[in-house]
């Protein structure tokens, strides 16, 4: 198993993203998942009708994208022989993690946030770095 394989990185990212989508889905129904839910990471979080709809939206968005990363992109990347396209996919993967990483860091630095908010930060920066060192 090549740990610098872009297809493996995308697959692992899709699996982790699916887990986060599940956490947000639970959050939409006011079920707090230990360590990862908004309520667990931000004790001052108050569920409202709007926040539940926003969590549902996030769950569907992340879940949809994770399905592509699990069921399509790994096999597509393994069959892809065009080096320029592979490099472009790698660049996009790394690039879209940068604003996400900054946003997650900002959220973890908010007053009242618990230590476990840094789990999401570590995951986000980890995938950014792993994607950056991937072989394209």
Would you name each region that the model predicts?
Residues 101-119:
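Membrane-helix boundary connector in multi-pass membrane proteins
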Residues 2-15, 86-89:
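Interfacial segments of alpha-helical transmembrane regions
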Residues 69-86, 108-109:
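Juxtamembrane helix-break-helix junctions at the cytosolic face
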Residues 16-54:
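Hydrophobic transmembrane helix segments
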Residues 68, 86-105, 123-127:
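Hydrophobic alpha-helical membrane segments
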Residues 18, 49-76, 92-96:
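Core segments of alpha-helical transmembrane spans in multipass integral membrane proteins
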Residues 43-47, 80-91:
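Juxtamembrane helix-capping/reentrant segments at transmembrane boundaries
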Residues 125-136:
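Membrane-water interface at the C-terminal end of transmembrane alpha helices
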